UniProtKB/Swiss-Prot annotation:
It comes from the Bacteria. InterPro entries: AICAR_Tfase_dup_dom_sf, Cytidine_deaminase-like, MGS-like_dom, MGS-like_dom_sf, PurH-like. GO terms for molecular function: IMP cyclohydrolase activity; phosphoribosylaminoimidazolecarboxamide formyltransferase activity. GO terms for biological process: 'de novo' IMP biosynthetic process. It catalyses: (6R)-10-formyltetrahydrofolate + 5-amino-1-(5-phospho-beta-D-ribosyl)imidazole-4-carboxamide = 5-formamido-1-(5-phospho-D-ribosyl)imidazole-4-carboxamide + (6S)-5,6,7,8-tetrahydrofolate; IMP + H2O = 5-formamido-1-(5-phospho-D-ribosyl)imidazole-4-carboxamide. The lineage of its organism: Bacteria, Pseudomonadati, Pseudomonadota, Gammaproteobacteria, Enterobacterales. The IMP cyclohydrolase activity resides in the N-terminal region. Belongs to the PurH family. One of its GO terms (cellular component) is cytosol. PANTHER family: BIFUNCTIONAL PURINE BIOSYNTHESIS PROTEIN ATIC, BIFUNCTIONAL PURINE BIOSYNTHESIS PROTEIN PURH. Residues 1-148 form the MGS-like domain. This is Bifunctional purine biosynthesis protein PurH. Its EC number is 2.1.2.3, 3.5.4.10.
Length: 529
């Protein structure tokens, strides 16, 4: 659909001034008459642009500290007026057609994110006239272009140049969708913020704001369609947050390989979030959202080599994550040794990418280096509802550990215990992790009974010929019975780290003492379902 509409008059009113001067100059140079409000009008005038204040156009001044600027029939009539149908009524009331509206809204999100933001500050940063103009222009996209993103400025000018100052209906329709997405996200933000304040507002809570609003509104942007979902008979797409604040699979750039699958993305997320837990050079290998090998060392090459040794069978077709730049030597080791679906790292050298390029099926992602973990929400869909919780960013420090056994752990046991405790947080419950000298040697995941996870971890270690004697064992939750300790002792585990909290803690501790095992309580559980 090419129905073109010339742009002869534009109304500009923006809070975010990025790029607006250049855009306005480009419009003016193409003969577009400029209308504007408040600070935007002053800025354009300072730059020497011919601009008409909306208050001069309407004959009605801005009032109430700027609360009422554009809510006027001469503004909305000019936007909503249907060309060829409402021309007579527009002419009768001296309403000039407005062909383009350039608006972005008061910075509500930035305002409420500030420490000490008052209710009054939040209220004053709720835009009224802006969303009204945006919706009016989007509704009348048949005749009017609505621009809410500065990233569209250049493309709009290029299209106008290619079409003698006009924009096509396809473009106007696309811009209208962006506009409705913009106002939906804006209203959702406001509803979420004030919805979370209801208990405090009514005196039911001393907290200024709750974590969870009474109505949860979510806005995600489609990044890509998937060939299929978790299984081939399911359709799927990948949606991301608009402003992701932490390096993640959502922000990662694919620099090589075929399109990511649904399962690739889920597994890559699991691998990346696990490797973020370590400060030393680390490697995490994941299969079906569970770590099957994790290690830290002095280099990512050695970390990969040690992680792979945990379970070479499961590593086949897995996802590999690093917390350092992927170098050529490590890339060569991976490609020479195994089939891998995805490699993700903060960055990759040119030499490394040349090596991985030899395998067209290998997907390589770079996500940038991360600083600290960003608090947020986790969601779990259930039939008819959504479970919402804070992200599990908890991790105990060495100073917070409690030794509850008669024997104290050695320095090496303590290091291994802290290492496998970090890993256990990312293994599906019931989770048991055996580790020795900064590498996993056996992982038992997702079993319905904790003792069987412990047994499986021992079996995996034995199958790979890894020495369990003197290793540490981590459990993501408490041991309900002593049988898990007995199973660990039978294969040579010498130190156990677990949350504690069972009604049979005394029996479990007694079992550790019987076997001469050092036992550490974290007082923090890490279920993962």
């Amino acid at each position: 659909m090419q129905q073109r509409r010339p742009v002869r008059r534009a109304l500009l009113s923006v809070s975010d001034k990025a790029g607006i001067i250049e855009f306005a100059q480009a419009l003016s140079a193409r003969g577009v008459e400029l209308l504007s409000t408040g600070g935007t009008a002053r800025l354009l005038a300072e730059k020497g642009l011919a601009v008409t204040e909306v208050s001069d156009y309407t004959g009605f001044p801005e009032m109430m500290d700027g609360r009422v600027k554009t809510l006027h029939p001469k503004v909305h009539g000019g936007i909503l007026g249907r060309r060829g149908q409402d021309d007579a009524i527009m002419e009768q009331h001296h309403i000039a057609p407005i062909d383009m509206v350039v608006v972005n809204l008061y910075p509500f999100a930035e305002t409420v994110a500030r420490v000490g933001c008052s209710l009054e500050d939040a209220v004053e940063n709720i835009d009224i006239g802006g969303p009204t103009m945006v919706r009016s222009a989007a509704k009348n996209h048949k005749d009017v272009a609505i621009v809410v993103k500065s990233s569209d400025y250049d493309a709009i000018i290029k299209e106008m140049d290619a079409n003698e100052g006009s924009l096509t209906l396809d473009t106007r329709f696309d811009l209208s969708i962006k506009a409705f997405e913009h106002t939906a996200a804006y209203d959702s933000m406001i509803a979420n913020y004030f919805g979370s304040m209801v208990p405090a507002y009514h005196g039911e809570s001393k907290e200024a704001a709750g974590r969870f609003p009474r109505t949860l509104n979510l806005n995600f942007i489609k990044k890509q369609d998937m060939r299929y979902g978790e299984n081939s008979h399911q359709q799927a797409a990948f949606y991301i947050e608009e402003n992701v604040k932490e390096a993640s699979v959502a922000t990662a750039q694919q620099v090589q390989g075929k399109a990511l699958s649904y399962n690739n993305i889920a597994d890559t997320d699991a691998a990346l979030e696990c490797v973020k837990a370590f400060n030393e050079p680390a490697c995490v290998i994941v299969k079906h959202a569970n770590p099957c090998g994790v290690a830290v060392s002095t280099s990512i090459l050695d970390a990969y080599d040690r992680a792979y040794k945990t379970d070479p069978t499961s590593a086949f077709g897995g996802i590999i994550a690093f917390n350092r730049e992927l170098d050529a030597e490590t890339a060569q080791a991976i490609i020479s040794r195994q089939f891998v679906e995805v490699i993700i790292a903060p960055s990759a050298t040119e030499e490394a990418l040349k090596i991985t390029a030899a395998k067209q099926n290998v997907r390589v992602l770079t996500c940038g280096q991360w600083a600290q973990r960003v608090p947020g929400l986790d969601f779990k869909r259930v039939n008819g509802g959504l479970l919402v919780q804070d992200r599990d960013l908890g991790m105990v420090s060495e100073a917070e550990l409690r030794v509850v056994s008669k024997r104290q752990p050695t320095e090496q046991e303590l290091r291994d215990a802290l290492f496998c405790w970090k890993v256990a947080k990312f293994v599906k419950s019931n989770a048991i992790v055996y580790a020795k000298e900064n590498m996993t040697i056996g992982i038992g995941a997702g079993q319905m009974s904790r003792v069987y996870s412990a047994k499986i971890a021992g079996i995996k270690a034995a199958d790979e010929g890894l020495e369990v004697k003197g290793s540490a064992m981590a459990s993501d939750a408490f041991f309900p019975f002593r049988d898990g300790i007995d199973a660990a002792a039978a294969v040579g585990v010498s130190c156990v780290i677990q949350p504690g909290g069972s009604i049979r803690d005394d029996e479990v501790i007694a079992a550790a003492d019987e076997h001469g095992i050092a036992m550490i309580f974290t007082d923090m559980r890490h279920f993962r379902h």
